[in-house]
Regions:
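Short coil/linker segments at helix-helix boundaries
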Residues: 1-4, 49-52, 57, 67, ...
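Surface-exposed, low-hydrophobicity segments enriched in Gly/Pro/acidic/Ser residues
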Residues: 121-142, 154
Length: 183
């Protein structure tokens, strides 16, 4: 409880510092700390509204801060059950910002079939490719390869999904009791 009260007080101080700050470098970091604080407080709607009003189109911030803010934005959207929006952002992070690729992969959550279809309809071609890559890593690498091939037959990322498919096959063979024998 004391930590929550401290964080609420801190969020007020951070917001005041953000609003009064003129230096883009510091302002971006205040915004990041605000997003992080509201996320941990469970104030997801506040974080989403703040991001959309204050952070979304701020190209003066460093690339790292822009993507990290976007990651917390996606996390808050997910907590608000806006799964398609969150997963689309995670696909962008996975594709476009290598330092957070693992975070995007871990945070991405495949959807029910109907939601997945709607998500693909919202996505542009590049986002669709990223979505199928994530789908292949999570669920069915061969389906991921098939769909990425339809979008871009020269895409080299399909090799990763092929390795994933081989890993799954190896695991299934090694852990199959038919292949064990008693000495």
């Amino acid at each position: 409880v004391a930590d929550t009260l401290t964080l609420r007080q801190l969020s007020g101080e951070l917001k005041a510092a953000f609003m009064n700050c003129k230096d883009p470098f510091l302002k971006g970091r205040y915004g990041y700390q605000l997003m992080k604080t509201w996320h941990y407080l469970g104030e997801y709607e506040t974080a989403v509204q703040f991001y959309e009003a204050q952070l979304e189109n701020k190209t003066k911030f460093t690339t790292s801060i822009q993507w990290r803010n976007r990651g917390y934005y996606a996390a808050c959207l997910y907590k608000l059950k806006r799964y398609a929006d969150a997963n689309l952002i995670y696909a962008d992070i996975f594709r476009l910002y290598a330092p957070q690729r693992l975070d995007a992969y871990v945070s991405f959550h495949p959807l029910e079939e109907s939601d997945w279809t709607q998500l693909l309809a919202k996505a542009d071609k590049e986002q669709q490719r990223s979505l199928w890559m994530l789908y292949g890593l999570y669920n069915d690498p061969l389906k991921g390869i098939e769909e990425i091939f339809k979008l871009d037959p020269t895409n080299t990322e399909m090799e990763l999904l092929l390795v994933r498919a081989v890993n799954i096959a190896e695991f299934n063979i090694i852990n199959n009791p038919v292949y064990y024998w008693e000495e």
